Amino acid sequence: SMLSPSLEDYLEEIYRFHTGLGFARVTDISHKLNVSMPSVTKAMRKLRSLDYITYQRYGHIGLTDKGIETGKFLVRRNHILQEFLVMLRAN
């Protein structure tokens, strides 16, 4: 199923925290994306129902295999877009 741009942002951040720290927490995501805790919690419920993350209410947010694959793709896509924009500016 296709993720909304908003859920993609959440998943990409979770993936970045995951590769850095090994986990993410709702507070981390809230600060990083500058969104309220209830908004993050709502998004986490959605991502969990779509089988991208494992989520314990007061615990850490983990990634499923599907979440890791998608997160990796989103980060890579972002890098490609950034390089493309740099190329456009150079011309």
Model-derived features: positions:
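Basic, amphipathic "hinge/linker" alpha-helix immediately C-terminal to the N-terminal HTH DNA-binding motif
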Residues: G59-R77
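Short, hydrophobic-biased segments on the C-terminal half of alpha helices
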Residues: M44-R45
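Key DNA-contact positions within bacterial/archaeal DNA-binding proteins
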Residues: P38
